[in-house]
């Protein structure tokens, strides 16, 4: 995907600049990095809460309403990080929403699954997301695990999903719209929408242009007052939002390649603002570029829009992940495992071995502590000049993952009904 190529290039550029050490003036040395990290490197142990408490003991996570981790997709360990951090934040800091890099309609359908446990919903999503990074065994097993977790929570304490992406799979979006409207009676002028959606969802009948249904629906839902009286305000606004999001997808995929990332992240932020409730607290794992809190090379990531919002300017925390000797599942090659390595702060062995001592394959660096060199370092690993972006302007922690396998190819026979 376009964004993954961008991030890999950036990571390699950063590491090559960093790895030269003190060959150039104004560079930090390997010893500088080691001294900066030796007291700020923590083992991640999800089996004992005190390890996580120690990582964040000087942070006070109560101050944050949004915490985002930046991943490379389809690495198995991502789903361990996702579930365990979500559970920790939910149980200790009342984070009640999982903010996902998925379309609004998919979040709606997954919330239906979390309410019912109906595997047919997941099967429907699997069918239409095959050949994407989000159609792996771990991805759907995560939702099953979340469903079981929620069953042990009081109704009002259960975690729900918020999706902010555009509708990359319009057929799934139409299925969600039909789920909203199918039980409604006396729809008057909106009955034409129900007929259009029934033809597609139940009979498989569709025009050559997959977006034509959304265009027809758009003409039928212009009267919001009438729509809200027929469907109720919440359902009508969701129906309209999903339909608008389908049309946004058409606009996005019709854009020049160099405009794709710019437009997509702005569209995702606009969706988030519509869906946001200031009482919510969000945790999510997104593609790594999206969690940066400041523009890079003229590109504004999703999190940078949130950071610029006065309501969230000091309430968002970003955590990056670097992968050492890991594998990911490549959906373009039928989910074959391929190597991924994006070293960002990884020192020569004489120093790195000391940092990793007794820390296993999963540990985290705190970068934003008082008087940290990372608060003075530009994105190329050099001492920042006036006006340059600091590393900690982008993200404040860095997780190191070692030796993770790739996600598994989905088994379409498992859980099918």
How does the language model describe each region?
Residues 2-9:
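Sec-dependent signal peptide recognition
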Residues 19-66, 119-121, 148:
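N- or domain-start disorder-to-order transition segments that initiate the globular core
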Residues 28-34, 39, 51, 276, ...:
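C-terminal regions of proteins
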Residues 67-68, 96-101, 160-163, 282-285, ...:
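Structural recognition of the beta-strand scaffold that forms the well-ordered cores
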Residues 76-80, 106-111, 170-173, 291-295, ...:
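Extracytoplasmic/secreted cell-surface and envelope-processing proteins
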Residues 113-275, 286-288:
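A substrate-binding/cap region within the structured catalytic cores of diverse enzymes
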């Amino acid at each position: 995907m376009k964004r993954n190529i961008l991030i890999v290039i950036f990571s390699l550029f950063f590491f090559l600049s960093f790895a030269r050490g003190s060959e150039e003036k104004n560079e930090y040395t390997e010893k500088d990095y080691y001294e900066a990290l030796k007291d700020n490197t923590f083992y991640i142990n999800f089996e004992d809460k005190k390890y996580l408490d120690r990582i964040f003991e000087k942070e006070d996570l109560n101050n944050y309403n949004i915490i985002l981790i930046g991943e490379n997709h389809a690495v198995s360990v991502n789903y361990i990080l996702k579930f365990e951090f979500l559970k920790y934040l939910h149980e200790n800091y009342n984070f009640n929403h999982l903010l996902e890099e998925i379309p609004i309609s998919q979040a709606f359908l997954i919330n239906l699954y979390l309410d019912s446990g109906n595997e047919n919903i997941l099967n429907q999503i699997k069918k239409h997301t095959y050949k994407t990074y989000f159609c792996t065994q771990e991805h759907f097993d995560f939702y099953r695990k979340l469903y079981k977790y929620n069953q042990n929570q009081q109704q009002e304490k259960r975690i729900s999903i918020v999706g902010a992406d555009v509708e990359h799979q319009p057929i799934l979006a139409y299925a969600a719209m039909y789920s909203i409207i199918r039980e409604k009676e006396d729809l008057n002028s909106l009955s034409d929408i129900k007929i259009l959606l029934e033809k597609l969802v139940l009979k498989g009948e569709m025009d050559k242009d997959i977006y034509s249904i959304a265009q027809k629906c758009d003409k039928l839902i212009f009267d919001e007052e009438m729509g809200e009286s027929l469907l109720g305000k919440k359902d009508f606004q969701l129906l309209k939002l999903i339909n608008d999001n389908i049309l946004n997808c058409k606009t996005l995929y019709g854009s020049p390649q160099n405009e794709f990332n710019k437009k997509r992240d702005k569209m995702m932020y606009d969706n988030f603002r519509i869906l946001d409730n200031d009482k919510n607290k969000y945790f999510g794992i997104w593609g790594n570029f999206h969690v940066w809190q400041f523009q890079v090379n003229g590109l504004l990531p999703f999190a940078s829009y949130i950071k610029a919002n006065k309501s969230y300017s000091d309430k968002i925390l970003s955590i990056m992940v670097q992968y050492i000797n890991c594998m990911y599942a490549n959906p373009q090659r039928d989910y074959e495992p391929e190597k991924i390595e994006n070293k960002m702060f990884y020192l020569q062995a004489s120093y790195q071995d000391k940092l990793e001592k007794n820390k296993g394959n999963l540990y985290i660096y705190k970068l934003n502590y008082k008087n940290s060199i990372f608060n003075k370092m530009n994105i190329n690993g050099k001492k920042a000049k006036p006006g340059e972006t600091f590393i900690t302007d982008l993200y404040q922690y860095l997780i190191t993952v070692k030796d993770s396998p790739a996600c598994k190819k989905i088994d379409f026979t498992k859980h099918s009904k």
